[in-house]
Amino acid sequence: MPKLEIYKNLFLDKIGKNFTNLEISELLEPFKAEFDGFDESSGKIKIEFNDTNRPDLWSYLGLARQIKTYFFGEMPYYDFFSKKGDFKKFYGEILVDGKMSQIRPFIFGFLAKGLIINDKMLETLIQFQEKLCQNYGQKRRRIAMGMYNSNFIKFPISYIASSPNHKFVPFGMDYELSLLEINEKHPKGLEYSHIIKNFDKFPLLLDDNNNVVSYPPIINSNNIGSLKVGDTDLFVEVTGIDFEATLLALSIAACDFYDMGFEILPVKTVFREPFNLDFKELVCPYYFQEEVEFNVENINRLLGSNLTLERICLSLKKMGVNSYSKDFKNYIVPPFYRNDFLHEVDVIEDVMIGEGLSSFNPELPKAFAVGRLSPLEEFSRNVRNLMVGMGFQEMIYNYMGSKKDFIDRMNINDQNFLKVSNPMTENYEYIRASIIPNLLKSESVSSNFPYPHKIFEIGKVALKNLDTTEGTSTFTNLAFLMSGKEISFNEINSIVATLFYYLNIEINLIESKTTFYINGRGADIVIEGFNIGGFGEISPYVLNNFGIFIPCSVFEVNINKLMSRS
């Protein structure tokens, strides 16, 4: 969970009132944040958040904004946001190469002017950038932010798909390296190059003088890409693979810079062919959030309350959320810096927090029951202990993913996969039917760790099944992966034999026709005439799709079927 260290004097100055440490702790409670101490020598407060839904709070500016709104009724407003059909005047352009649509497609930016950066401000900006990129940005994979002295940049800026051999001086060095060399030698390249290394070309940001601004999301240019104390004019950009996440990160940054005292000047992004978007250009910061409908009866039913519409609107306003009624329906308008309202339940949560938890009377549960582990869970725990005992490390993955990872890279068809009809992003478009793609994706970013690699997961998978009422079936699977120069079919066969020996289950093996195995090096596992899974060596074609350059063998079985025949 995100942790902040903020200067107490800056924090209180921004709130406009003085508070003791105990009072600050109480101010933080509604926002799922905890006061974690005060260092008198540095003058810093330590704060830890208990969830990641509100990245707008991960700076003293965002926290102060929310506290002033909640406790003192000061609703912020920002007049520099463009909206659909109402673009603001822009002061620079970013031209996006069409080839970036398949690499890291989105980039948006703004200019910030009129304030001289001092030591504490610079430290605050760097911490904000780090928290946003590491947590909300999923260690720069989802989004990454860059900040520059705009006086050294000539607009328009070009965001291009560059040759890996393009050279520039990266931040922290005094000599040129190619993009490929940065991936292999620079500390930031070693840490983050896995995000883009599987592409033939890499992202590059150039100004109109053909000077390198940065190599996102890896490293800035040493000549342009460093902020210093005394700088006054800044260019801020965010790149990413998720349209809304990239826009939101930029919006949060713009609001924070404005609250710090900067003037915000919009910048236009122009997308060139073959981008398949509903728009060709966007002036940012841009308000993209959708209104969410809510129902008074639903709110009172879930909260066990009897709130009026007026009271609900006041509670929402304390959270910075405006609301209105039209045609006998009620809607909320998310703030510029928030996009965490995915469902009416999220609105209800804000009403609850705005109302204050202490205003709800505690009630004892009306039903009581004693739980126990299900037979499936007991069996799974036994299997888990065996895997750990054989030297495997357990992984935990998301059940949803992209067509690219689950289907295309695996060289299989999608006939058994469940597709989400209205996905928020194509990265979470399918529900997994196998754990193996998750294991391979982990392996693809683990080449810097000593071999052999031995990882496993016990988790849910879902498949189409037209014989059921729902049209789907959900199972618990066990899957593991072994990788290394010496890993072969014989190695994994030995592990499989050991596993089933300790489970006291007899199995039969038949040659597998699975397309992602090397021909002749895969086996299906059969018990009492039923196929429950298989194992084998992954084909070089599939390994290459994932950017893996060392032999891998995988295993996967259906634990439900396995347990029923044990």
Curated annotation (Swiss-Prot):
Q: What is its EC number?
A: 6.1.1.20
Keywords for this protein: Aminoacyl-tRNA synthetase, ATP-binding, Cytoplasm, Ligase, Magnesium, Metal-binding, Nucleotide-binding, Protein biosynthesis
- Output the Gene Ontology cellular-component terms: phenylalanine-tRNA ligase complex
The cofactors it requires, by name, are: Mg(2+)
Q: Look up keyword Nucleotide-binding and say if it applies.
A: yes
Q: Which GO terms describe its biological process?
A: phenylalanyl-tRNA aminoacylation
Q: Which NCBIfam families match?
A: pheT_arch
| Subunit-structure text | Tetramer of two alpha and two beta subunits.
- Protein name (database record): Phenylalanine--tRNA ligase beta subunit
